[in-house]
Each structure stands twice: as C-alpha cells, then as structure tokens.
Amino acid sequence: MAAQVRVLRQRIRTAKSMKKITKAMELVATSRIAKAQDQVAASLPYARAITEVLTALASNARIDHPLLTPRERVRRAGVLLITSDRGLAGGYSTNAIKTAESLLARLRADGKEPALYVIGRKGVQFYRFRNRPIAASWTGFSEQPTFADAREVGQTLIKVFTAGVDDADGDPGPDGVFGVDELHIVSTEFKSLMTQRPVAKILGPMQVEDRPRAEGLLPAYEFEPEAEALLDALLPKYINTRIYAALVESAASESASRRRAMKSANDNAVEMIEKYTREMNSARQAGITQEISEIVGGANALAASGSEV
C-alpha cells in the first residue's frame, strides 16, 4: 500500500506541474489574442482606404498593369500558406494545410502548376517531411507578425508575379526568376474565440469590383502624378497590406486555438489531480484499515495465548 501511495503522490505532483504550465500558456495566449485583434482593427482603415484608391484608379484609367491584368493563360500559380511556428495549438495548422492541399489539387486539375510559399515552421516541416518542393519559406513571426514581415514576404511574391511565367525546361528565362501567373493566399479568419475558419483567397491579380454609382453627380478624379506612377507605387503596398491583414488575423486565430487547447489540457490536469487524490486517499484508507486489522488480530492472538496459559 505504501508503494502505491508513493506512486500516486508522484503522479499528483506531475499533474500539478503540468497544470501550472498549461494555465500559464492559456493566459499568454489570451493576452496575444487581444493584441492581435487590436492589430486587425488598426489595419482596417488603411486597407479600406488603399483599396478605394486603387479601385478608383483602375476604374477611371485604362491601364494594363501586371498586378491588375489577368494573364491569358495561367501556367503556374503561387500559393502562400500561413501556419504556426509552434505546436500545442489544436488543429490550427492542420486545418490550414488541409485547405491548402484542396487548393493545390484544384489548381492541378485546372492544368496549373502550383508553386508553394510557406509561413510557419509547422507548414515547412509538413512539406519537407514529405519531400514536397517549397519555393520559399519564412519562420519565426507567426504569433507576433509585423508589417516588416509582411513586406518581406510581399517583395518575394510581387517579384515572381510581375515576372510571370517565361521559363521552359527548368530554365528561369531571361529575367532569372521562376515566375507565377496567379497568386493565392491560404490563411485563417478569426470569427470569435471559439470559431476560426481557414480560407483560400485570390491575392493577385487584384480583383476590381464595378460598384454601382449613386445617382447625381459622378465623382471626378484627378491623378497626380499620372495613374501609372500611382499604381506602381500603391499596388505593392496593397499586396503587402493584404498579407499583413492575413498574418495578424491568423495570429489571433492561432492564439485562440492555443488558448482553447491549453484550457482543455488544464481541465484534464484538474480531473487527473482529483482522480489520483481519490485513489491515494482510498489506498491510505485501505492501508490504515489493514494496519488496524493486523493490530486487532495480534491483540486477539495474544489474548488467546494468555488465556490458554
């Protein structure tokens, strides 16, 4: 009985240590959700403004720009996948990878060669373990992304997209770049603390929607400098802004998923502590009962031997 009590006491100590760790991780994840939500809210006005300006430029000027004009034939499509750098986040990265895999399968079915760009160690590990090619990868900022991180990713994607596909038989062509004709992004939308949804969206070319104009005077725009120069300056910022928005929303989703996973682990630790405590108390009770029985039995034996004398 004593050995069993020692084992159970050690299990209780282990469960309590695990509970401290999971509770701390839950609190950290909760604080990061709030920070990421603030980043999302702060980025929205800029994203709306730059989208409105670009829509006005594209609608009021007949301009052919690589980031605006769909290619006649899409030979290769780039896919940017956002996953986490660390584990213990439930199905966050797994669900994003599943969405990316579905997109890659659709692209192949349409006769398009996919080129994969991955953010986060979990995504990189998934594809490298399976010997799947990755065109470029970035790690180390999935939980707390900055606009500088988004700009670094955006520079690579803009370069390959503006280059287009002009290679053949493994030769990158005169520009030395294995370009793409289309850009997609797979990220995770933050709906609430309990709901996050992986989504796949078109990143390039920019999709300009023809919105109905209100009755009355039509708005007049004067571009200074010329519309072409403005597009050259603003379209890369638009791509970077889209990537940054996806990064911060995915960061909020990752933290929410990790918080949920850690809360579940914390609840399980509490249940384990209660279970092992009950078992330890039962074992101690059984040990005490056995000792009392042995004492009573010994006393009865002594009494019996004394009466015989």
Swiss-Prot record:
Per UniProt, the keywords (alphabetical) are: ATP synthesis, Cell membrane, CF(1), Hydrogen ion transport, Ion transport, Membrane, Transport
Its Gene Ontology biological processes? Answer: proton motive force-driven plasma membrane ATP synthesis
- GO cellular component entries: plasma membrane; proton-transporting ATP synthase complex
Membrane topology of the entry: Peripheral membrane protein
InterPro entries of this UniProt entry? Answer: ATP_synth_F1_ATPase_gsu (IPR035968), ATP_synth_F1_gsu (IPR000131), ATP_synth_F1_gsu_CS (IPR023632)
* Chief site of localization: membrane
Which Gene Ontology MF annotations are present? ATP binding; proton-transporting ATP synthase activity, rotational mechanism
To which protein family does this belong?
Belongs to the ATPase gamma chain family.
- Outline what the protein does: Produces ATP from ADP in the presence of a proton gradient across the membrane. The gamma chain is believed to be important in regulating ATPase activity and the flow of protons through the CF(0) complex.
NCBIfam families attached here? ATPsyn_F1gamma (TIGR01146), PRK05621.1-2 (NF004145)
Q: What protein does this entry describe?
A: ATP synthase gamma chain
